[in-house]
Amino acid sequence: MRILGIDPGLRTTGFGVLERHGHKLVYVASGTIKSNGNADLPSRLKTLYDGVSELVSTYRPDCASIEKVFVNVNPQSTLLLGQARGAVICGLMSGNLPVFEYTALQLKQAVVGYGRANKDQVQEMVVRLLNLEGKPGADASDALGVAICHAHGGETLAAMAGLAPQLAQKGLRVRRGRLVG
C-alpha cells in the first residue's frame, strides 16, 4: 500500500510518500510545497491545491493521511491553517483518495511511542524507521510521520475515534489505543 502523508501549512506544506509491504516501510519521496507569502490568500490556497493534486497524479498513492488542526492561541492563525487544510484535502479528494486524519498526539504515539515527544524525537525516529541517510526537513518529517502513523494501524485508531460518541453512551472510551470502562 502506498501512503501519502501531509503536514498542512499555509506557508509550507510537507509531504511524504512511503510504501508498506507487510510490516516493512519503504521510503519513496518527501519534500514541501511552498506558497508565495506575498500573494493573496486565494492564490496561496490554489498553489497548495495544485501542488497536492500533482503529488497525487505523480505518486499514485492508495490513500492519504493528514495531520488534524490544533487550536492555536491566535484565532487568525487557526483559521488560516484550516483554510490551508481545506485546500489540501480538496487536492487529495480530486484524486478520489480515502483521507485519514490524525492528531499530533496520535502521530507521536505511533512514531515515537510517546504522545508528548518533541519534533526532534519524531524526526529522529522517522530517519530510523525509514532507514534514511539524512534528516528530512521538519515539515517533510512530520508528513512522513503521519504516513507512518497510518501504516502502523492508524486506520484502526481513526475508526475507534469515530466511534467515540457511541462508546461514551456505553460508558466506554478509547485510551492509549485501548477500550477502557
Swiss-Prot record:
Task: Provide the residue positions that the database annotates as binding Mg(2+) 1.
Answer: D7, D139
* Pfam families named among the record's database cross-references: RuvC
UniProt keyword annotation of Hydrolase present:
yes
Taxonomy, superkingdom: Bacteria
- Residues holding Mg(2+) 2: E67
Compartment list? Cytoplasm
Where is the signal peptide, in residue numbers?
A: none
Q: Which cofactor does it need?
A: Mg(2+)
Molecular function GO labels: crossover junction DNA endonuclease activity; DNA binding; magnesium ion binding
Which reaction does this enzyme catalyse, per its entry? Answer: Endonucleolytic cleavage at a junction such as a reciprocal single-stranded crossover between two homologous DNA duplexes (Holliday junction)
Catalytic machinery residues: D7, E67, D139
Instruction: Give a yes or no for keyword Repressor in this entry.
Output: no
Q: Which SUPFAM superfamilies match?
A: Ribonuclease H-like
What EC identifiers does the entry list? 3.1.21.10
Gene Ontology biological-process annotations: DNA recombination; DNA repair
Q: Name one GO cellular component term.
A: cytoplasm
* Note on how the cofactor is bound: Binds 2 Mg(2+) ion per subunit.
Which controlled-vocabulary keywords does the entry list? Cytoplasm, DNA damage, DNA recombination, DNA repair, DNA-binding, Endonuclease, Hydrolase, Magnesium, Metal-binding, Nuclease
- Tell me how this protein assembles: Homodimer which binds Holliday junction (HJ) DNA. The HJ becomes 2-fold symmetrical on binding to RuvC with unstacked arms; it has a different conformation from HJ DNA in complex with RuvA. In the full resolvosome a probable DNA-RuvA(4)-RuvB(12)-RuvC(2) complex forms which resolves the HJ.
Check the record and name the PANTHER family matching this protein: CROSSOVER JUNCTION ENDODEOXYRIBONUCLEASE RUVC
Please report which protein family the annotation says this sequence is part of: Belongs to the RuvC family.
The job of this chain, per UniProt, is described as: The RuvA-RuvB-RuvC complex processes Holliday junction (HJ) DNA during genetic recombination and DNA repair. Endonuclease that resolves HJ intermediates. Cleaves cruciform DNA by making single-stranded nicks across the HJ at symmetrical positions within the homologous arms, yielding a 5'-phosphate and a 3'-hydroxyl group; requires a central core of homology in the junction. The consensus cleavage sequence is 5'-(A/T)TT(C/G)-3'. Cleavage occurs on the 3'-side of the TT dinucleotide at the point of strand exchange.
UniProt name for this protein:
Crossover junction endodeoxyribonuclease RuvC
